[in-house]
Regions:
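Conserved long alpha-helical elements within nucleotide-processing catalytic cores of c-di-GMP signaling
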Residues: 1-5, 11-37, 48-52, 56, ...
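A short glycine-enriched loop-to-beta-strand structural element that forms part of the catalytic core
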Residues: 4, 49-58, 77, 83-118, ...
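Conserved helix-loop-beta segment at the catalytic/binding core of cyclic-nucleotide signaling proteins
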Residues: 33-64, 291-295, 348, 358
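Catalytic strand-loop-helix junctions within cyclic-nucleotide turnover domains
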Residues: 58-67, 85-88, 92-109, 133-136, ...
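Catalytic core of bacterial c-di-GMP phosphodiesterases, primarily the EAL and HD-GYP domains
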Residues: 103, 167-176, 201-279, 354
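C-di-GMP signaling machinery
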Residues: 106, 110, 115-158, 168, ...
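Active-site core of bacterial EAL-family cyclic-dinucleotide phosphodiesterase domains
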Residues: 140-197, 234, 295, 352, ...
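EAL-family c-di-GMP phosphodiesterase catalytic domain
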Residues: 184-185, 236-243, 262-277, 289-398
């Protein structure tokens, strides 16, 4: 017999622990496991637990159609809402499936199933089967991870800067640093490909340190030219758990004789939620240095309003998904206008990213938005272009 290994990631598990606590998470897993075991107690199916948020199945049988039907049954079973402490917990699950001729190399087959499951999760697909195409993609990723080490060691990384315009003074007061990778053979590697890879390894710490140091070096160079620009840079969830991060930032500021106002740090809501307690501790330590911290991509996370009270952010960046259709969407206008008013009352400065036309910019100015960012103001540009853009001191000359 052939075997099919099915690995399921229970994405909603993190929401359970955030809302109801760790004990509720265990209760949720227990109920879900019992439901599955009762429903799929068959001679050809073994059900067990994988990693913390995973359930695994070993199914004997050749027929692909039969396996597809079974997977759909499992999906329907797991998608049913679970009620805990009177709260309905919606289910979100991702399936990875691998085929095995035998279980003699079970570990490698589970690795294949996990690769498929991770792809399903990343691409927001419900079910992914491991095949030759996915195998090749995995090989490419492995090579990129190897090359990433060389990129850091051999100066293949560089920064572009996207200007951020004060909508009050109409002056460029800050920029966002965006890391890029110029591979010697493959050309420019998109950040949405190599950053997620780096975040899965310790390389993200090396990249973040490189960016912090380079930003401090650049800020010092601009100061000598009379440009007093704050540089915003992004931190990942792994960075927030780095107990040497804050000391490194402080050392870089001191080395380049910069004040804390030279840097600003941006953290996505989802990154902060990976380890809420650790994130809050790190953010408070960063703020103690005098550096402002922004919540990035606001409006796309889970239970956003409660997080504004929990996390000690200074700045709120409204996600571009609300801004790009601002002119044509009355709903987006209502959300953005009320968010600006509410968050100003809470003491936040507001940044709108994704501004692509004059009408959206004017609406944001009318509503009192503090800072704007987007291609209408400027695309990401080099440090030399920033000098010209900023010294021109009026939007449209960049």
């Amino acid at each position: 017999d052939r075997y099919h290994l099915i690995l399921v990631n229970i994405e909603s598990l993190s929401d359970v622990s955030h809302v109801l606590g760790m004990s509720a998470e265990k209760d949720y897993l227990c109920r879900l496991s019992n439901r599955i075991k009762e429903r799929f107690s068959r001679p050809n199916i073994l059900v067990g637990r994988g990693h913390e948020s995973e359930i695994c199945f070993i199914v004997s049988g050749d027929e692909m159609a039969g396996i597809s039907t079974l997977v759909n049954e499992i999906q329907r079973c797991m998608d049913k809402t679970v009620i805990l402490s009177g709260v309905e917990i919606p289910s979100e699950n991702y399936f990875g499936i691998a085929c095995a001729e035998s279980l003699s190399e079970e570990d490698s087959h589970w690795q294949s199933a996990r690769s498929a499951m991770n792809m399903a999760k990343e691409e927001r697909l419900k079910i992914v089967w491991f095949d030759e195409k996915l195998k090749q993609a995995g090989i490419v990723r492995s090579l990129l991870i190897t090359d990433l080490k060389d990129a850091i060691e051999h100066d293949q990384l560089y920064l572009l800067y996207q200007p951020k315009l004060s909508l009050i003074s109409n002056r460029v007061t800050s920029v966002e640093a965006l890391v890029r990778w110029r591979h010697p053979e493959k050309g420019i590697i998109p950040p949405d490909l190599f950053i997620p890879l780096a975040e899965k390894t310790a390389f993200i710490h090396d990249i973040t340190r490189w960016v912090i140091n380079y930003c401090c070096k650049q800020a010092a160079a601009w100061k000598l030219m009379g440009l007093d620009l704050t540089i915003a840079l992004n931190l990942s969830s792994r960075d927030l758990s780095d107990d040497r991060l804050v000391d490194y930032i402080q050392a870089c500021l001191a080395e380049h004789e910069l004040s804390a106002s030279s840097l600003q740090l941006e953290i996505t809501e989802s990154a902060a939620l990976q380890d809420e307690k650790q994130s809050i501790e790190t953010i408070l330590a960063i703020k103690k240095l005098g550096i402002e911290v922004a919540i990035d991509d606001y409006g796309t996370g889970y239970s956003s309003l409660s997080h504004l009270r929990t996390f000690p952010f200074d700045i709120l960046k409204i996600d571009r998904s609300f801004i790009t259709d601002l002119v044509d969407s009355k709903m987006n206008q209502a959300v953005v206008k009320s968010t600006i008013a509410m968050c100003h009352d809470m003491g936040f400065s507001i940044v709108a990213e994704g501004i692509e036309d004059a009408k959206a910019l004017n609406l944001l100015k009318q509503w009192g938005c503090d800072v704007g960012q987007g291609y209408f103001i400027s695309r990401p540009i080099s440090s030399e272009e920033i000098q010209v853009f900023s010294l021109a001191n009026t939007m449209g000359k960049g």
